[in-house]
Amino acid sequence: MQYNLTRIDPDAPNEQYPVGERETVTDQLLEDQVHKNIYMGKLEDVLRGAVNWGRKNSLWPYNFGLSCCYVEMTTAFTAPHDIARFGAEVIRASPRQADFMVIAGTCFVKMAPIIQRLYEQMLEPKWVISMGSCANSGGMYDIYSVVQGVDKFLPVDVYVPGCPPRPEAFLQGLMLLQESIGQERRPLSWVVGDQGIYRAEMPAQKDLRREQRIAVTNLRSPDEV
């Protein structure tokens, strides 16, 4: 039986089959066909990409809140916002089963050791989102009993501003965390030794959107938003 494979657009110059019926075959054509059928690269890059894809699309949050920002965080789990779209709807009651922790609310000095202990009980890889002005910098509580920013004792990956932030802001912070995880480079197993973790630099959204904000000329009143 003789047959020829054809593409959807057989008249395209680079999509004519079979190649053997052509009078001349350029090196570029052969190279294009090779790259379409053979992966040219490191298997390690493919493996890291697959692992990061699985990690960022299956983030299990630790069910833990401190203040009013926690109410806005839990609102993101309701149907209008549907955090399940990002694979982060599986709330865990134990830090050992969670992938990331959201510090949502005011962090008092008495609570800081407990938060740090809960963070240490989380298994690697783990991430932290600081949600709200109080968690970011102490907010309006510039007093001795409030920690002026949870990054003083925890490594924070994403800061979500607001007092309190809307659920949409929390979802944007979650998407930024997913973007950061997708670019991470960390050992695939602890067996190979401690090789450190590479995290890509994530510039502040305030700086990235500066030109966009300056370009706005028509400002609507609050009752029109």
UniProtKB/Swiss-Prot annotation:
PROSITE patterns reported in the protein's UniProt record: COMPLEX1_20K
Keywords from the named record: 4Fe-4S, Cell inner membrane, Cell membrane, Iron, Iron-sulfur, Membrane, Metal-binding, NAD, Quinone, Translocase, Transport, Ubiquinone
Membrane topology: Peripheral membrane protein
Enzyme class name: translocase
InterPro entries documented for this protein: NADH_UbQ_OxRdtase-like_20kDa, NADH_UQ_OxRdtase_20Kd_su
Reported cofactor(s): [4Fe-4S] cluster
Cellular compartments per GO CC: plasma membrane; respiratory chain complex I
Pfam families assigned: Oxidored_q6
Domain of life assignment: Bacteria
A Gene Ontology biological process term: electron transport coupled proton transport
The EC number(s) this enzyme carries: 7.1.1.-
Compartments in which it is found: Cell inner membrane
GO MF term list: 4 iron, 4 sulfur cluster binding; iron ion binding; NADH dehydrogenase (ubiquinone) activity; NADH:ubiquinone reductase (non-electrogenic) activity; quinone binding
Reaction catalysis annotation: a quinone + NADH + 5 H(+)(in) = a quinol + NAD(+) + 4 H(+)(out)
Textual note on the cofactor: Binds 1 [4Fe-4S] cluster.
Protein residues bound to [4Fe-4S] cluster: 68-69, 134, 163
Known function: NDH-1 shuttles electrons from NADH, via FMN and iron-sulfur (Fe-S) centers, to quinones in the respiratory chain. The immediate electron acceptor for the enzyme in this species is believed to be ubiquinone. Couples the redox reaction to proton translocation (for every two electrons transferred, four hydrogen ions are translocated across the cytoplasmic membrane), and thus conserves the redox energy in a proton gradient.
Family, per entry: Belongs to the complex I 20 kDa subunit family.
Quaternary structure note: NDH-1 is composed of 13 different subunits. Subunits NuoB, CD, E, F, and G constitute the peripheral sector of the complex.
Name this polypeptide is given: NADH-quinone oxidoreductase subunit B
Taxonomic placement: Bacteria, Pseudomonadati, Pseudomonadota, Gammaproteobacteria, Pseudomonadales
